Amino acid sequence: MRVGVSESEDSDGHVIEDEDLEMARQIENERKEKRAQKLKEKREREGKPPPKKRPAKKRKASSSEEDDDDEEESPRKSSKKSRKRAKSESESDESDEEEDRKKSKSKKKVDQKKKEKSKKKRTTSSSEDEDSDEEREQKSKKKSKKTKKQTSSESSEESEEERKVKKSKKNKEKSVKKRAETSEESDEDEKPSKKSKKGLKKKAKSESESESEDEKEVKKSKKKSKKVVKKESESEDEAPEKKKTEKRKRSKTSSEESSESEKSDEEEEEKESSPKPKKKKPLAVKKLSSDEESEESDVEVLPQKKKRGAVTLISDSEDEKDQKSESEASDVEEKVSKKKAKKQESSESGSDSSEGSITVNRKSKKKEKPEKKKKGIIMDSSKLQKETIDAERAEKERRKRLEKKQKEFNGIVLEEGEDLTEMLTGTSSQRKLKSVVLDPDSSTVDEESKKPVEVHNSLVRILKPHQAHGIQFMYDCACESLDRLDTEGSGGILAHCMGLGKTLQVITFLHTVLMHEKIGEKCKRVLVVVPKNVIINWFKEFQKWLVDNDEELDTIDVNELDSYKTIEDRRRALKAWHSSKTPSVMIIGYDLFRILTVEDDPKKKKPKNRNRRLEKAKEDFRKYLQNPGPDMVVCDEAHKLKNDDSALSKCMVKILTKRRICLTGTPLQNNLMEYHCMVNFVKPGLLGTKTEFANRFVNIINRGRTKDASPLEVSFMKRRCHVLYDHLKKCVDRKDYRVLTEAIPPKQEYVINVRQTERQCALYNAFLNDIVGDSGLSKRLLPDYHMFSRIWTHPYQLVLHEQRMERERVMREDAEEEADFIDDGDGSESESEGSFKSGSESDSGKSVVLSSDDEGSSKKKKNGNKPEIKKTAPQKKRKFLNSDDEDEEDGEDTAMAILQDGIRQSKRLAGEEADLRDTDTPPEYTGWFARLGLVKEEDRDDFALSNKLILLVEIIKKCEEIGDKLLVFSQSLESLTLIKRMLEYMAGTGQWFADGHEALNAEGEETWSWLEGEDYMTIDGSVQSGKRDAVQTSFNDPLNLRARLMLISTRAGSLGTNMVAANRVIIFDACWNPSHDTQSLFRVYRFGQTKPVYIYRFIAQGTMEERIYKRQVTKESTSMRVVDEAQIQRHYLGNDLTELYQFTPSTFDPDVEISCAPPKDRLLADVIHKNQHAVVDYIEHDTLFANVEDEKLTEQEMKDAWTDYEKDKSGMPVRAQYAAPPMPGFPNGMIVGQNVQALLQNRMNQGIRVDQMQHDILFKELQKMRIKDAGTAVKIVLLRNLLEQILPYIPDEMRGGMSEFNTHFIRLVHETDRKMETPADLLRKSLESFKTVIKMVKMIPTCREPLARMTRDYPYLFA
């Protein structure tokens, strides 16, 4: 089996290799060794004795000393009882003297035993005629019990007679083999055993002829007695068959030749097996006798389930050993009979003692027997489902067609010539597009009749190159070519980073395909499913880019369903859209789509208050939205489809069309299985089932992505990541924010570890000791998390929460009393249409609460009964963090993450009480802090008790001073309410401007305060979508300078909103799901941003929040590995979840300075310097996820990941330590070089003073470099100023969209600092940029005069 592109048709679509299977086995062996070593160390630490070795291993060793061949050919494992008896037997058979004594003793009693056995037989047969079946079973049970007692008290010896009984059993087994040999069911694997059966039979005959007369008689008597025992243990339905068998066998009295008895046995068994299946015989054991007999002894190998059975040594013994053998057969008989069919296929010949024969038989048996799945072994392609194989083959064929098309045609054409931007950057990323042709219509022969799929010129001029490639990707996925319009098409994921213009790409793509003559016939109706809070934004974007851009583009009917409030209105709107003859687009929210199409669960009782009008209209809704539904569907923020078991995903997959386009900026959220759900929506079966995907990718990547992974696991992970990335590269188009760095100012992210105050530490420890207990892990993780979050936010939050809970409890009791007094009926028929409005998507399904842990009406009653849920109360599932969630699945992110990672759950997490809040505060939590006296009423307005609030206030004041707008994201509405109250309190008491700072943008004598709607704005779940758009527009208004702060709930405002007016973001608390925080920061870092962006993440140091952030780091690393194929440093250990409850605060020592260098952000540096008691340290977030070049696979290694010819080399990346190299030409920071005095004089003539430079943005960035030089900074600022002077004289068509040079030089500064280059390198790059521009514009007439002036003032720059 080969991987990747293979010439063989059989290997199409294969992504797993044979060498990978071997590597997986090696990893599993390493993991087993590690587990054994850890267990041993744990026992040593606890003082426990080492575990005793199993006797089976000793038996194996002893048998190997006696006979190596017998050890290799040991019989299969029997029942546990047989093994226990075999243990005692094998311990006393070592010495030769005992064996001689046993032989002599057994010969004396041969005749006596023969008489006793015949007597027992007659007694048993007579009792069968007289007694009933029930009495017969009771006797057999008593006899077996008696036999067991006797064998347990006997010594561990075995007689010569029992060995002969084993030989008779072996002869029977040979007859079975002979019969199986002639059957039609035999396959190729049994051929070796067939060839050996004749030899085995001949050898058995020769051995039987050499037996003495006494041995033959003993064998005959043993055989008869054994059959009697079997007959007694048989069930009623098998008794007649056994009687018939025993009569036939007893009639055979001749014992002269054992071959004769063998033939008769064979004939009898064939007769018995013809009408009905043969009863399976008990498991046999290996025979070992005296030295001369052991050479001729036969070995019988029987099938096993798991491992080789223990080697059983049998020697001469007393008379009781015969009874023991009989009882063993009786015990095993019933179990073995259930598997008789299996034995007929896998049983083997046991007379050949050669090693080769046994080996062949074992191999053939392993092939015949279905293997149990082993942990850590990758699935072979033969184990995959047919759907998976077909999907992989179809995708491979599509990729071949696309590669051929790309070689023959490239429809994305850039304008000829070079503009200013391209000359400076050295790339074509900023060059304007000349034309974008998606399909040349090559199938049409007539040139005049060809209708290429081409983007309209009015749209081409506003597109960027990466957006043109995204449009081409969507066309290749949904349509592929005009020749394949009759096929069902397929889908793809446009996984462009937030801010790269995915909405514009979709609008351009839809306009292009809908207005095409051929495609428009097949695709007229498009459904765009988006989050509720961006419905209006999408509608406005269609108007902006189509209607407002060019009247010729206004050819598509665009409508949104949210504006229709009643069921009937929505039905009419969908009917008009579905039956439209012109191209039309319908925009709908995820929640409304689910409500209109969800099917009732037949297992659940229908609610009495359900909307009957909606139930009647659902049939039409499903027709319009699902089957036949739209011709194409577009899903924005498609990571909402992360759980294929959710109601939303179940509704979405029922859409009939396969032309599905998914948009997401964060394709990977909590785990790889969520990624699988999204890919499976657009490409069903491509990644296989969940089990197949987990086996082939998830398990391997998860093992190797942590720092405690072995080198082999890391190597295997890298290979799997590359295979997964390459496997999906034609259906997932990923572009990260590096595209933004070439077009907008840079971004800096900082993680600030905030120190806990003494009061917070005392409360945290008290809660750990008194409430959580000594177990270390509470059974109520989510309630504990919320309690901790209140502590690290502000201690008084505990009191406010309890007060709100008490108020709600009283209101709930009053409502229950009123409900008991007034009977309103079920309300099923009286429900008005007006109740089913757009608010039903979220407002009627949720109650707006202040935080996720607000219990509301879902508190548990004391009697244990489920509380009645009011109409306005949430339905069954409530939100985890706040009421801002846009669908019911988002609220379960945390709970699902904890469940998947093995954290202990309470009953409420396990879903036993699904109608109750997952985050209900347990009764023992109520008022626990009041007993300690750590929280007082006067703490309400003491905001110094929280260092997070102190840092927040300082950053807001600094932003006021420099004129920057700020966004504050929090996942808890409690925190947002606290921030509001703090700002209003400080403004009302005159504390805000008491420190003397001034707002830069305050006009004249205008006094700013903190009034909602004027000074700050809020977006949370209670703000309707229409109002959100108005708030966003007002905040982004460049003339509205007073609105300088926006408070946003993480989930309500992190999706799809545009806040480019702000350039600083504070993420107040870390979220379990990293995608929410990532979405938040990209509200400001997107196209349209004109200032450098600064992100500050507040993390409560030493707390559970710090551990949550570490989980985010691991998840983002996985996302970049799989989606971007970036090799990221493996972050933290794999067992971090077990450390969630550890509290390791850092105490403040005023004599010890903060252990970190000043950040490049001057604002943050000032804040940290002023508040060192509040900050432990900081880290740059982007540095954690910088692409580690050392871990990248080379081109050859990428091939090896597919062909598996050799293993990858692994190694931990080592970050280069900072060491400033000597800078020749710049000693002691002084400017040295040609015409230095002239440079200084010209600088003075232009009025450039040092005090003015201190406020220059470029100069500030130069001073933040880790390797900096003042002289070089002055030179670079001068070059920038000269280019700014000549820019107005450059024609607009040559600028390439460049309006200033500041951004270009700042990008050079950051690039140089990131690569740890010297200031000399930066100066060289700056001079190259300067000369490039001068060379480009020197022939332009308008530029001649300013260039002549520069030449006179700075001749050395033009030399």
Swiss-Prot record:
Return the Acidic residues bias intervals.
64-73, 257-271, 814-832
Does rRNA-binding count among this protein's keywords?
Answer: no
Binding sites annotated in the UniProt record for ATP: 496-503
Q: What spans are recorded as compositionally biased (Low complexity)?
A: 347-357, 833-847
Keyword hit for DNA damage: yes
Task: Please report, in chain numbering, the residue ranges of the motif DEAH box.
Answer: 636-639
Q: Which domain of life is it from?
A: Eukaryota
Phenotype when the gene is knocked out = Temperature-sensitive with 38% embryonic lethality at 25 degrees Celsius. A large proportion of surviving animals are sterile. Surviving animals also have gonad developmental defects such as defective gonadal arm growth and as a result irregular distal tip cell migration, and 24% of animals had a protruding vulva phenotype. Reduced brood size. Double knockout with lin-35 results in 43% embryonic lethality.
Residue ranges, compositional bias (Basic residues): 50-61, 77-86, 103-123, 139-149, 165-177, 194-204, 219-229, 362-376
EC number(s) on file:
3.6.4.12
Leader sequence segment: none
> What residues does the Helicase C-terminal domain cover?
951-1134
Domain named Helicase ATP-binding: residues: 483-685
> Mind listing the GO biological process terms from this record?
chromatin organization; DNA repair; embryo development ending in birth or egg hatching; gonad development; morphogenesis of an epithelium; reproductive process; vulval development
Q: Which GO terms label this protein's molecular function in UniProt?
A: ATP binding; ATP hydrolysis activity; ATP-dependent chromatin remodeler activity; DNA binding; helicase activity; transcription coregulator activity
Region named Disordered: 1-402, 809-891
Localization: Nucleus
Q: Name one GO cellular component term.
A: nucleus
As for family, the record states: Belongs to the SNF2/RAD54 helicase family.
In UniProt terms, what function does this protein have? Answer: Required for embryonic development and gonadogenesis. Also, functions redundantly with the transcriptional repressor lin-35 to regulate somatic gonad development.
| PANTHER family, A to Z | RAD54-LIKE, TRANSCRIPTIONAL REGULATOR ATRX HOMOLOG
Q: What is this protein called?
A: Transcriptional regulator ATRX homolog
Q: Which organism is it from?
A: Caenorhabditis elegans
